[in-house]
Amino acid sequence: MTRQIVIRPKASDDLDEQFAYIAKDNMDAALRFFDATRETISQLAKMPGIGSPVQNSSLAGLRKLAVKGFNKHLIFYLTQDNYIDVVRILHAARDLPTIIDSEE
């Protein structure tokens, strides 16, 4: 069963920011990143368990999956009964627990 995808506004902003950052140096790479992110999110809709659980007790239930071809860019998501909730799209060097805590 393919689930619907819900992309939170912060995740959409993350994608825009990373696209712009990559595009400063290489527009072709930025376009590939954007397409790869969309493809990876589509893959989540078909196989939500493909990602790994985030190893942090304060982020229970959150999973992550690297963007295909851009392994340092991670999609963080929650699996719901009928949909996939894309929470953030961040570079692996970012401190996710601190980012999430600051939003609450």
Predicted regions and their residues:
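Enriched for short, Lys/Arg-rich terminal
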Residues: 67, 71-104
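Basic, Lys/Arg-enriched alpha-helical interface segments
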Residues: 1-62
